[in-house]
Amino acid sequence: MLTNEQITSVKGRGFLRNRGTECFSGRIVTVAGLFTPDQLHAIAECSEKYGNGKVIFTARLAAEIVGIPFDKIPEAEAFMAERGLYFGGTGAKVRPITACKGTTCVYGNIDTQALAKVIYDKFYIGMRDVKLPHKFKIGVGGCPNSCMKPSLNDVGVEGCRAFSFDSELCRGCKKCAVAESCPTKAVSVVNGKAVIDTSKCTSCGVCVGKCPFGAVPKEAASVCRIFVGGTWGKTQRMGTLLNSVYSADEVPSVIEKVMLWYKENGYVKERLGATVDRIGTDALEAAIATDDLITRKDDILAKPLLERQ
């Protein structure tokens, strides 16, 4: 019979016990769930050789090889490592990075896969040894359709468009192409001019370039908005939307500041959203508005985690 120490030791390496057995499911993590044919062949071969022949793809886009006996785990790890693949994705640290298909999707406002790769390298790989108060999930979505649910991640990135509207160029068409294209019905024609209801507009970008007279320009910068503190499961919390919007190049720096703030202020076993609620969104916004957290990075990472008194 396996001991709790044995079960815990492999859980930290990406192996979760299968209920009622002494076998485990091992998670293979890639960049935002992108797999090459060779990687898929390797996963299938590992499943047949060391598991029960079944593979499950998780909600965070990892490939989970089912039914690996405890004593075969080292062999499975070595087999996959020889093929450039590794088990992981568990524990109180950065979890597998998820991203939608915004890179190729017609609604994608940003290159989600490219941004996810940067985040994967910097945080999932670069900070894999950093122990955080709790799990830390990062998701990248290409548009407000929210297929990847950015607002339910500890940090969620959502691509949108920083478009503008020039009322002087609006001719008040009876059939306004901008209004017709708007999925949230945020545009209406009032007294011969298009009016945009900002409370309904999601900056999805669908209307960009639709006006033949240029009231909505054909080009609009792609930007990112960032949600922090989202959770789903036994406790639900929609992520708090940060006040600013950011370029894709600025996103990794913001994520790093949020993570350092969480490392410094979060209690052990407290999710980021609970830390934000306890300390306040204004405090987080103020902290990430400067580079102080980055300057103190080494000290913050070296400090022990906070325990509740």
Label every PLM stretch briefly.
Residues 52-59, 90-92, 129-135, 190, ...:
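Flexible, glycine/charged-enriched surface loops at secondary-structure junctions
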Residues 285-309:
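Long C-terminal interaction/binding lobes of large macromolecular proteins
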